Curated annotation (Swiss-Prot):
PANTHER family: URIDINE KINASE
GO MF term list: ATP binding; cytidine kinase activity; uridine kinase activity
Originating species: Clostridium novyi (strain NT)
Record protein name field: Uridine kinase
Pathway the protein takes part in: Pyrimidine metabolism; CTP biosynthesis via salvage pathway; CTP from cytidine: step 1/3; Pyrimidine metabolism; UMP biosynthesis via salvage pathway; UMP from uridine: step 1/1
Keywords, ordered alphabetically: ATP-binding, Cytoplasm, Kinase, Nucleotide-binding, Transferase
CC terms in the record's Gene Ontology section: cytoplasm
Name of the encoding gene: udk
Catalytic activity as recorded in UniProt: uridine + ATP = UMP + ADP + H(+); cytidine + ATP = CMP + ADP + H(+)
Lineage: Bacteria, Bacillati, Bacillota, Clostridia, Eubacteriales
Amino acid sequence: MMRPILIGITGGTGSGKSTVANEIYESFKDDCIAIIEQDSYYKDQSHLTFEDRIKTNYDHPNAFDTELLVEHLKELSKGNTINKPIYDFKEHTRKKEVVEVKAKDIIIVEGIMILQDVELRNLLDIKIYVDTDDDVRIIRRILRDIKERGRTIDSVVDQYLGVVKPMHSQFIEPTKKYADIIIPEGGQNKVAIDIMVSKIKQILSENK
């Protein structure tokens, strides 16, 4: 098996990273592509009380177990299988279960801090930044956290203004300079996604 192509997709919360990742995923056969969500690599907090766990700043680099993510990407690059963690956002810690992920020709890594860490960044063959208007992102964040993570609208808005927005300015927005490609409006930008898919297919063809 050839070394996998590692594609990093980053951008602010609600920017459309997952949509871009899924659009690329759907353009290939299931047996040749896999998606690794950085959200799965939030640190295990089972040693903390629930009251302490809910205080976690999920928008800070220290919230992630980047060392484990880097280790897993290196293993996938060698053709090995990994056990990806599962994070429970209602309990604010990892589940005991894991998901087995096998090495594929294409590995997409998607998350807000993908380009923030130097070692992680250097593993990536293609680095994508999804750039979306702040108003659109907060609306998406509110809808997602209420529907998928059991949050109230007040708690989401308070978190966005007090934590998410300043963390975006400090840690995420500056990583745009490391991107090979910037995709405005995320999954709505079909032209940019089609260009990306064509480029990936070209690299795959050259590597065979």
